């Protein structure tokens, strides 16, 4: 879903350099210095308006979180939530998910979240899907051995594609949920999309996979 362009979004991000890392290339290999501790670092690629990343940071203060989104206005709405939360363990990046190795060293990230990514349903756009093999190559470089990806979507086609993509890549599927909200999974933190879909009774799919 497209988000309306937000006036002043660029200046808003630039005026909050504590939370929005404006030169992430300079932080490569030294994210522990950015956060001021050596806690594990989890990233969400495609963080949207920030409900998930903020909720996770408040729930798990012993983990550092980085929300990543390429859309300027979207990231500005995420900043709203981060500022309101005052959580010290969140940072935001406006970068593309295909270029993560420019900003993170090998094994520097402990876990990744992909939530409600664009399904890019047309076959000619397969390479744009965040679970396509070239993206998995990138993720593998910044995660440790046996690093985890947690993935959620309402799109069955993308879910089935991702199951196959992870398996073909040689990843291990730890757990799979075919109807997350009907399960007894206790630790779910919802995104904005997910909360909207849940009200409509839509099925949410989830999986956890390791390299």
Swiss-Prot record:
EC number(s) per entry: 2.1.1.33
Location of region: Interaction with RNA: 124-129
The keyword Methyltransferase appears for this protein: yes
InterPro entries: SAM-dependent_MTases_sf, tRNA_(Gua-N-7)_MeTrfase_Trmb, tRNA_methyltr_TrmB_bact
Highest rank taxon of the organism: Bacteria
Active site residues according to the UniProt entry: 118
PROSITE patterns: SAM_MT_TRMB (PS51625)
Record bears the keyword Iron-sulfur: no
Residues that bind S-adenosyl-L-methionine: 44, 69, 96, 118
Enzyme class: transferase
GO molecular function: tRNA (guanine(46)-N7)-methyltransferase activity
Function: Catalyzes the formation of N(7)-methylguanine at position 46 (m7G46) in tRNA.
Sequence similarity: Belongs to the class I-like SAM-binding methyltransferase superfamily. TrmB family.
Protein name: tRNA (guanine-N(7)-)-methyltransferase
Organism: Streptococcus equi subsp. zooepidemicus (strain MGCS10565)
The encoding gene: trmB
């Amino acid at each position: 879903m497209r988000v309306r362009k937000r006036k002043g979004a660029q200046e808003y991000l630039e005026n909050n350099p504590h939370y929005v890392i404006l030169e992430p290339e300079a932080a490569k290999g030294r994210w522990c210095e950015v956060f001021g501790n050596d806690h594990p670092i989890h990233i969400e690629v495609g963080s949207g308006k920030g409900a998930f990343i903020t909720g996770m940071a408040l729930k798990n203060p012993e983990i550092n979180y980085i929300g990543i989104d390429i859309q300027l206005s979207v990231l500005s709405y995420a900043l709203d939530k981060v500022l309101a939360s005052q959580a010290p363990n969140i940072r935001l990046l406006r970068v593309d998910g295909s270029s993560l190795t420019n900003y993170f060293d090998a094994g520097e990230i402990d876990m990744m979240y992909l939530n409600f990514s664009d399904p890019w349903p047309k076959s000619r756009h397969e390479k744009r899907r965040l679970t396509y093999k070239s993206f998995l190559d990138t993720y593998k470089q910044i995660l440790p051995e046996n690093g985890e990806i947690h993935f959620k979507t309402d799109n069955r086609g993308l879910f089935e594609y991702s199951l196959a993509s992870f398996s073909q890549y040689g990843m291990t599927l730890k757990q799979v949920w075919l109807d997350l909200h009907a399960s007894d999974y206790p630790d779910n933190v919802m995104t904005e999309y997910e909360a909207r879909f849940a009200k409509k009774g839509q099925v949410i799919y989830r999986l956890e996979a390791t390299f």
